[in-house]
Protein backbone atom coordinates (compact mmCIF):
# COMPACT_ATOMS: atom_id res chain seq x y z
CA UNK A 1 0.00 0.00 0.00
CA UNK A 2 1.17 3.51 -0.82
CA UNK A 3 0.03 6.43 1.31
CA UNK A 4 0.00 10.01 0.07
CA UNK A 5 -1.16 13.16 1.79
CA UNK A 6 -1.86 16.63 0.46
CA UNK A 7 -3.40 19.68 1.96
CA UNK A 8 -6.82 21.13 1.27
CA UNK A 9 -7.74 24.76 0.65
CA UNK A 10 -10.72 24.87 -1.69
CA UNK A 11 -12.71 21.62 -2.16
CA UNK A 12 -13.54 22.16 -5.83
CA UNK A 13 -9.94 22.86 -6.82
CA UNK A 14 -8.70 19.88 -4.86
CA UNK A 15 -11.24 17.64 -6.56
CA UNK A 16 -9.74 18.71 -9.89
CA UNK A 17 -6.23 17.94 -8.68
CA UNK A 18 -7.37 14.62 -7.28
CA UNK A 19 -9.00 13.67 -10.55
CA UNK A 20 -5.92 14.60 -12.58
CA UNK A 21 -3.71 12.56 -10.31
CA UNK A 22 -5.97 9.53 -10.45
CA UNK A 23 -6.01 9.58 -14.24
CA UNK A 24 -2.22 9.62 -14.21
CA UNK A 25 -2.16 6.83 -11.64
CA UNK A 26 -4.62 4.58 -13.44
CA UNK A 27 -3.78 4.98 -17.14
CA UNK A 28 -0.12 3.89 -17.11
CA UNK A 29 -1.15 0.57 -15.60
CA UNK A 30 -3.89 0.19 -18.20
CA UNK A 31 -1.54 1.11 -21.03
CA UNK A 32 0.88 -1.60 -19.98
CA UNK A 33 -1.89 -4.17 -20.15
CA UNK A 34 -3.82 -3.03 -23.22
CA UNK A 35 -1.18 -1.01 -25.15
CA UNK A 36 -4.11 1.26 -25.93
CA UNK A 37 -3.72 4.73 -24.43
CA UNK A 38 -1.12 7.27 -25.52
CA UNK A 39 -0.05 10.55 -23.94
CA UNK A 40 -2.35 12.64 -26.12
CA UNK A 41 -5.36 10.59 -25.03
CA UNK A 42 -4.44 10.98 -21.36
CA UNK A 43 -4.14 14.75 -21.79
CA UNK A 44 -7.53 14.93 -23.50
CA UNK A 45 -9.06 13.08 -20.56
CA UNK A 46 -7.51 15.58 -18.18
CA UNK A 47 -9.05 18.50 -20.06
CA UNK A 48 -12.44 16.84 -19.99
CA UNK A 49 -11.96 16.11 -16.29
CA UNK A 50 -11.36 19.79 -15.52
CA UNK A 51 -14.69 20.71 -17.06
CA UNK A 52 -16.45 17.80 -15.37
CA UNK A 53 -15.24 18.55 -11.86
CA UNK A 54 -15.67 22.33 -12.17
CA UNK A 55 -19.34 21.79 -12.97
CA UNK A 56 -19.76 19.99 -9.62
CA UNK A 57 -18.70 22.96 -7.50
CA UNK A 58 -22.14 23.45 -5.93
CA UNK A 59 -22.58 19.75 -5.13
CA UNK A 60 -19.13 19.57 -3.55
CA UNK A 61 -19.86 22.56 -1.33
CA UNK A 62 -23.21 21.09 -0.31
CA UNK A 63 -21.45 17.92 0.85
CA UNK A 64 -18.85 19.93 2.77
CA UNK A 65 -21.61 21.90 4.51
CA UNK A 66 -23.75 18.85 5.22
CA UNK A 67 -20.96 16.93 6.94
CA UNK A 68 -20.10 20.11 8.86
CA UNK A 69 -23.70 20.29 10.10
CA UNK A 70 -23.58 16.75 11.52
CA UNK A 71 -20.47 17.37 13.67
CA UNK A 72 -20.27 13.86 15.12
CA UNK A 73 -17.59 12.62 17.51
CA UNK A 74 -15.46 9.55 16.95
CA UNK A 75 -17.36 6.23 16.77
CA UNK A 76 -20.60 8.27 16.66
CA UNK A 77 -20.47 9.28 12.97
CA UNK A 78 -23.90 7.75 12.31
CA UNK A 79 -25.58 10.47 10.23
CA UNK A 80 -22.32 11.31 8.44
CA UNK A 81 -21.79 7.72 7.35
CA UNK A 82 -25.44 7.28 6.36
CA UNK A 83 -25.29 10.41 4.21
CA UNK A 84 -22.00 9.59 2.47
CA UNK A 85 -22.75 5.93 1.79
CA UNK A 86 -26.19 6.90 0.49
CA UNK A 87 -24.62 9.12 -2.16
CA UNK A 88 -22.09 6.46 -3.08
CA UNK A 89 -24.77 3.77 -3.38
CA UNK A 90 -26.83 6.00 -5.69
CA UNK A 91 -23.75 6.21 -7.90
CA UNK A 92 -23.23 2.47 -8.15
CA UNK A 93 -20.76 1.80 -5.33
CA UNK A 94 -21.17 -1.34 -3.25
CA UNK A 95 -20.93 -0.65 0.48
CA UNK A 96 -19.56 -2.95 3.15
CA UNK A 97 -20.66 -1.55 6.50
CA UNK A 98 -19.34 -2.16 10.00
CA UNK A 99 -15.84 -3.09 8.87
CA UNK A 100 -13.32 -4.06 11.57
CA UNK A 101 -16.22 -4.33 14.01
CA UNK A 102 -16.77 -0.56 14.01
CA UNK A 103 -20.46 0.32 13.46
CA UNK A 104 -19.77 3.64 11.70
CA UNK A 105 -16.92 2.34 9.53
CA UNK A 106 -17.47 1.28 5.91
CA UNK A 107 -15.76 0.63 2.62
CA UNK A 108 -17.24 1.52 -0.77
CA UNK A 109 -16.11 -0.15 -4.02
CA UNK A 110 -16.85 0.31 -7.70
CA UNK A 111 -15.37 -1.42 -10.74
CA UNK A 112 -13.34 -4.58 -11.13
CA UNK A 113 -9.80 -5.68 -11.71
CA UNK A 114 -6.62 -3.70 -11.26
CA UNK A 115 -5.29 -1.20 -10.55
CA UNK A 116 -7.08 -0.75 -7.23
CA UNK A 117 -6.99 2.88 -6.10
CA UNK A 118 -8.19 3.67 -2.56
CA UNK A 119 -9.14 7.17 -1.42
CA UNK A 120 -9.57 8.09 2.23
CA UNK A 121 -10.32 11.04 4.49
CA UNK A 122 -11.39 11.48 8.11
CA UNK A 123 -14.98 12.17 9.17
CA UNK A 124 -15.05 12.67 12.96
CA UNK A 125 -15.10 16.00 14.78
CA UNK A 126 -13.63 17.42 18.00
CA UNK A 127 -15.25 17.80 21.45
CA UNK A 128 -16.41 21.32 22.38
CA UNK A 129 -15.39 22.76 18.99
CA UNK A 130 -18.81 23.96 17.83
CA UNK A 131 -18.31 27.05 15.67
CA UNK A 132 -20.33 29.10 13.22
CA UNK A 133 -18.83 28.81 9.73
CA UNK A 134 -17.13 31.83 8.21
CA UNK A 135 -16.56 33.54 11.57
CA UNK A 136 -12.95 34.37 12.50
CA UNK A 137 -13.50 34.45 16.27
CA UNK A 138 -15.00 32.04 18.77
CA UNK A 139 -18.74 31.92 18.17
CA UNK A 140 -20.17 28.44 18.82
CA UNK A 141 -23.40 27.26 17.27
CA UNK A 142 -24.09 25.41 20.53
CA UNK A 143 -21.85 26.19 23.51
CA UNK A 144 -19.94 23.09 24.61
CA UNK A 145 -21.07 20.98 21.65
CA UNK A 146 -18.68 19.12 19.34
CA UNK A 147 -17.75 20.56 15.97
CA UNK A 148 -15.47 20.27 12.97
CA UNK A 149 -12.43 22.16 14.21
CA UNK A 150 -9.94 20.26 12.05
CA UNK A 151 -11.54 20.30 8.63
CA UNK A 152 -12.78 16.71 8.63
CA UNK A 153 -15.96 17.91 6.95
CA UNK A 154 -14.02 18.68 3.75
CA UNK A 155 -12.10 15.58 2.72
CA UNK A 156 -14.87 13.17 1.78
CA UNK A 157 -16.42 15.72 -0.58
CA UNK A 158 -13.08 16.00 -2.36
CA UNK A 159 -12.45 12.28 -2.77
CA UNK A 160 -16.03 11.26 -3.54
CA UNK A 161 -16.51 13.74 -6.37
CA UNK A 162 -13.02 13.02 -7.68
CA UNK A 163 -13.90 9.31 -7.70
CA UNK A 164 -17.19 9.97 -9.48
CA UNK A 165 -15.35 11.93 -12.17
CA UNK A 166 -12.85 9.09 -12.59
CA UNK A 167 -15.70 6.58 -12.72
CA UNK A 168 -17.33 8.52 -15.55
CA UNK A 169 -14.15 8.43 -17.62
CA UNK A 170 -13.57 4.75 -16.89
CA UNK A 171 -17.07 3.90 -18.09
CA UNK A 172 -16.83 6.10 -21.15
CA UNK A 173 -13.48 4.66 -22.26
CA UNK A 174 -13.88 1.06 -21.02
CA UNK A 175 -10.98 1.39 -18.58
CA UNK A 176 -10.70 -1.48 -16.08
CA UNK A 177 -9.84 -0.86 -12.45
CA UNK A 178 -11.37 -0.57 -8.99
CA UNK A 179 -12.10 2.56 -6.97
CA UNK A 180 -12.31 2.28 -3.19
CA UNK A 181 -13.59 4.98 -0.80
CA UNK A 182 -13.07 4.68 2.96
CA UNK A 183 -13.52 6.94 6.02
CA UNK A 184 -11.12 7.68 8.84
CA UNK A 185 -13.48 6.91 11.71
CA UNK A 186 -12.54 8.28 15.16
CA UNK A 187 -9.25 9.65 13.82
CA UNK A 188 -8.95 11.94 16.83
CA UNK A 189 -8.98 8.79 18.98
CA UNK A 190 -6.64 6.86 16.67
CA UNK A 191 -9.55 4.50 16.34
CA UNK A 192 -9.78 2.83 12.92
CA UNK A 193 -6.97 2.89 10.37
CA UNK A 194 -4.68 0.42 12.10
CA UNK A 195 -7.61 -1.97 12.46
CA UNK A 196 -8.43 -1.69 8.74
CA UNK A 197 -4.84 -2.70 7.99
CA UNK A 198 -4.93 -5.50 10.56
CA UNK A 199 -8.08 -6.94 9.01
CA UNK A 200 -6.71 -6.93 5.46
CA UNK A 201 -8.88 -4.24 3.87
CA UNK A 202 -5.89 -2.79 1.99
CA UNK A 203 -4.28 -6.10 1.10
CA UNK A 204 -4.92 -5.83 -2.66
CA UNK A 205 -4.75 -2.03 -2.94
CA UNK A 206 -2.18 -0.69 -5.41
CA UNK A 207 -2.20 2.91 -4.18
CA UNK A 208 -3.89 4.57 -1.23
CA UNK A 209 -4.28 8.35 -1.33
CA UNK A 210 -5.28 10.35 1.72
CA UNK A 211 -6.29 13.99 2.03
CA UNK A 212 -6.27 16.30 5.04
CA UNK A 213 -6.46 20.04 5.58
CA UNK A 214 -3.28 22.00 6.15
CA UNK A 215 -2.03 25.58 6.18
CA UNK A 216 -0.84 25.47 2.58
CA UNK A 217 -1.53 23.67 -0.68
CA UNK A 218 0.81 20.81 -1.49
CA UNK A 219 1.92 17.29 -0.76
CA UNK A 220 4.73 15.57 1.08
CA UNK A 221 6.89 12.54 0.66
CA UNK A 222 9.17 10.88 3.16
CA UNK A 223 8.50 11.61 6.81
CA UNK A 224 5.55 13.97 6.71
CA UNK A 225 5.96 15.56 10.12
CA UNK A 226 3.27 13.55 11.89
CA UNK A 227 4.11 11.52 14.96
CA UNK A 228 3.06 7.97 15.55
CA UNK A 229 1.42 7.17 18.85
CA UNK A 230 -0.21 4.61 21.06
CA UNK A 231 -3.41 5.39 22.99
CA UNK A 232 -3.75 3.48 26.28
CA UNK A 233 -6.28 3.48 29.10
CA UNK A 234 -5.00 2.42 32.55
CA UNK A 235 -7.71 1.25 34.95
CA UNK A 236 -7.31 0.59 38.68
CA UNK A 237 -9.56 -1.48 40.96
CA UNK A 238 -9.56 -1.00 44.75
CA UNK A 239 -12.05 -1.22 47.61
CA UNK A 240 -14.70 1.37 48.45
CA UNK A 241 -15.12 2.69 51.98
CA UNK A 242 -16.63 5.69 53.74
CA UNK A 243 -13.95 8.35 53.52
CA UNK A 244 -14.80 9.80 56.95
CA UNK A 245 -16.18 6.82 58.88
CA UNK A 246 -13.74 4.05 57.92
CA UNK A 247 -11.12 5.23 55.43
CA UNK A 248 -8.72 2.50 56.59
CA UNK A 249 -10.98 -0.07 54.97
CA UNK A 250 -10.57 1.52 51.56
CA UNK A 251 -8.06 1.00 48.78
CA UNK A 252 -8.23 4.08 46.62
CA UNK A 253 -8.13 3.56 42.88
CA UNK A 254 -7.96 7.34 42.51
CA UNK A 255 -4.78 7.42 44.62
CA UNK A 256 -3.30 4.93 42.16
CA UNK A 257 -4.21 7.13 39.19
CA UNK A 258 -2.72 10.20 40.87
CA UNK A 259 0.46 8.35 41.80
CA UNK A 260 0.82 7.14 38.23
CA UNK A 261 0.42 10.69 36.93
CA UNK A 262 2.97 12.01 39.44
CA UNK A 263 5.40 9.26 38.48
CA UNK A 264 4.98 9.96 34.78
CA UNK A 265 5.48 13.68 35.28
CA UNK A 266 8.82 12.94 36.96
CA UNK A 267 9.64 10.71 33.99
CA UNK A 268 9.18 13.65 31.60
CA UNK A 269 12.57 15.08 32.61
CA UNK A 270 14.21 12.03 31.05
CA UNK A 271 12.27 11.95 27.78
CA UNK A 272 13.76 13.01 24.48
CA UNK A 273 12.72 16.46 23.21
CA UNK A 274 10.67 14.83 20.44
CA UNK A 275 8.73 12.53 22.77
CA UNK A 276 5.28 13.81 23.70
CA UNK A 277 2.68 12.52 26.13
CA UNK A 278 -0.69 13.71 27.42
CA UNK A 279 -3.32 12.29 29.74
CA UNK A 280 -6.80 12.88 31.11
CA UNK A 281 -8.47 11.26 34.11
CA UNK A 282 -11.57 9.64 32.67
CA UNK A 283 -12.93 8.21 35.94
CA UNK A 284 -11.99 9.69 39.31
CA UNK A 285 -14.68 8.22 41.53
CA UNK A 286 -18.24 9.14 42.37
CA UNK A 287 -18.22 11.58 45.30
CA UNK A 288 -15.70 12.88 47.85
CA UNK A 289 -16.98 10.96 50.88
CA UNK A 290 -16.47 7.56 49.25
CA UNK A 291 -13.03 6.08 48.67
CA UNK A 292 -13.05 5.37 44.91
CA UNK A 293 -13.01 1.67 44.14
CA UNK A 294 -12.49 2.32 40.44
CA UNK A 295 -10.55 4.97 38.56
CA UNK A 296 -8.90 5.28 35.17
CA UNK A 297 -6.58 7.53 33.22
CA UNK A 298 -6.12 7.79 29.46
CA UNK A 299 -2.66 8.38 27.95
CA UNK A 300 -1.25 9.21 24.53
CA UNK A 301 2.43 8.40 23.92
CA UNK A 302 3.83 10.11 20.78
CA UNK A 303 7.12 10.01 18.88
CA UNK A 304 8.58 9.77 15.36
CA UNK A 305 9.88 6.20 15.60
CA UNK A 306 8.36 2.91 16.66
CA UNK A 307 11.22 2.23 19.08
CA UNK A 308 10.74 5.49 20.99
CA UNK A 309 6.97 5.02 21.15
CA UNK A 310 7.49 1.52 22.50
CA UNK A 311 9.91 2.76 25.17
CA UNK A 312 7.38 5.33 26.41
CA UNK A 313 4.62 2.75 26.44
CA UNK A 314 6.80 0.28 28.40
CA UNK A 315 7.71 2.99 30.92
CA UNK A 316 4.04 3.90 31.33
CA UNK A 317 3.11 0.29 32.11
CA UNK A 318 5.92 0.03 34.68
CA UNK A 319 4.84 3.23 36.42
CA UNK A 320 1.21 2.06 36.45
CA UNK A 321 2.26 -1.24 38.03
CA UNK A 322 4.23 0.70 40.64
CA UNK A 323 1.21 2.86 41.44
CA UNK A 324 -0.93 -0.24 41.89
CA UNK A 325 1.67 -1.77 44.20
CA UNK A 326 1.84 1.37 46.38
CA UNK A 327 -1.95 1.51 46.80
CA UNK A 328 -2.61 -2.23 47.01
CA UNK A 329 -4.93 -1.99 44.01
CA UNK A 330 -5.14 -3.98 40.81
CA UNK A 331 -4.21 -2.48 37.45
CA UNK A 332 -5.18 -3.41 33.92
CA UNK A 333 -4.60 -1.52 30.70
CA UNK A 334 -6.17 -1.49 27.26
CA UNK A 335 -4.71 -0.23 24.00
CA UNK A 336 -7.43 1.91 22.43
CA UNK A 337 -5.63 2.86 19.24
CA UNK A 338 -2.27 3.06 17.56
CA UNK A 339 -0.71 4.71 14.54
CA UNK A 340 2.65 4.49 12.84
CA UNK A 341 4.50 7.69 11.93
CA UNK A 342 3.55 8.93 8.46
CA UNK A 343 5.98 8.06 5.67
CA UNK A 344 4.66 8.85 2.20
CA UNK A 345 5.61 7.80 -1.30
CA UNK A 346 7.94 9.93 -3.43
CA UNK A 347 6.56 8.93 -6.85
CA UNK A 348 3.00 9.78 -5.85
CA UNK A 349 4.09 13.04 -4.29
CA UNK A 350 5.90 14.16 -7.43
CA UNK A 351 2.97 13.14 -9.65
CA UNK A 352 0.61 15.10 -7.43
CA UNK A 353 2.81 18.18 -7.57
CA UNK A 354 2.92 18.06 -11.37
CA UNK A 355 -0.87 18.09 -11.49
CA UNK A 356 -1.19 20.78 -8.82
CA UNK A 357 1.00 23.02 -10.99
CA UNK A 358 -1.22 22.35 -14.01
CA UNK A 359 -4.36 23.30 -12.10
CA UNK A 360 -2.84 26.21 -10.19
CA UNK A 361 -3.97 27.92 -7.03
CA UNK A 362 -7.61 28.90 -6.46
CA UNK A 363 -8.61 32.45 -7.30
CA UNK A 364 -9.07 34.06 -3.91
CA UNK A 365 -11.77 36.69 -3.46
CA UNK A 366 -11.46 39.77 -1.28
CA UNK A 367 -13.69 38.05 1.26
CA UNK A 368 -11.37 35.00 1.26
CA UNK A 369 -8.34 37.18 1.91
CA UNK A 370 -10.10 39.16 4.62
CA UNK A 371 -11.11 35.95 6.40
CA UNK A 372 -7.59 34.53 6.10
CA UNK A 373 -5.99 37.66 7.56
CA UNK A 374 -8.44 37.64 10.46
CA UNK A 375 -7.69 34.00 11.26
CA UNK A 376 -3.93 34.55 10.98
CA UNK A 377 -4.17 37.44 13.41
CA UNK A 378 -6.27 35.41 15.82
CA UNK A 379 -3.85 32.46 15.93
CA UNK A 380 -0.75 34.67 15.57
CA UNK A 381 0.31 32.69 12.50
CA UNK A 382 3.58 33.70 10.79
CA UNK A 383 3.23 35.28 7.36
CA UNK A 384 3.95 32.88 4.49
CA UNK A 385 4.37 33.33 0.78
CA UNK A 386 1.56 31.93 -1.38
CA UNK A 387 2.73 28.41 -2.20
CA UNK A 388 1.62 26.29 -5.11
CA UNK A 389 3.08 23.18 -3.58
CA UNK A 390 5.83 21.78 -1.46
CA UNK A 391 7.68 18.49 -1.41
CA UNK A 392 9.48 17.46 1.74
CA UNK A 393 12.80 15.79 1.15
CA UNK A 394 12.78 12.34 2.72
CA UNK A 395 14.50 12.11 6.07
CA UNK A 396 15.13 8.40 5.75
CA UNK A 397 15.52 6.00 2.81
CA UNK A 398 12.43 5.37 0.67
PLM region descriptions:
Residues 1-12:
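N-terminal secretory signal peptides that target proteins for export/translocation
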Residues 17-28:
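Bacterial N-terminal signal peptides
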Residues 32-148, 157-179:
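Acidic/His- and Gly-rich active-site-bordering loop/insert found
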Residues 37, 258-398:
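Metal-dependent amide/peptide-bond hydrolase catalytic core
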Residues 53-57, 64, 68-71, 92, ...:
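Sec/Tat-exported extracytoplasmic proteins
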Residues 67, 108, 119, 152, ...:
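Divalent metal-coordination and catalytic microenvironments
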Residues 138-147, 153-154, 170-292:
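Histidine/acidic-residue-rich, glycine-tolerant segments that coordinate divalent metal ions
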Amino acid sequence: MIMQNYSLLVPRKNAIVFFLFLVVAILPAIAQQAKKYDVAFVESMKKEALSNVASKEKAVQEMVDMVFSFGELGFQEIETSKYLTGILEKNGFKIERGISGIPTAWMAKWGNGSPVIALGSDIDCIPKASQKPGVAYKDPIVEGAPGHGEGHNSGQAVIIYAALAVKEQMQKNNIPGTLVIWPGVAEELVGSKAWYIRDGYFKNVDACIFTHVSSDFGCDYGDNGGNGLVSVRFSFDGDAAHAAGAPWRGKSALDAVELMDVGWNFKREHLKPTQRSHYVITDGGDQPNVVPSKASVWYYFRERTYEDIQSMYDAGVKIANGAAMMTDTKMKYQILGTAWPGHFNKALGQAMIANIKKVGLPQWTDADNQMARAVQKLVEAPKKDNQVCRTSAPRRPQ
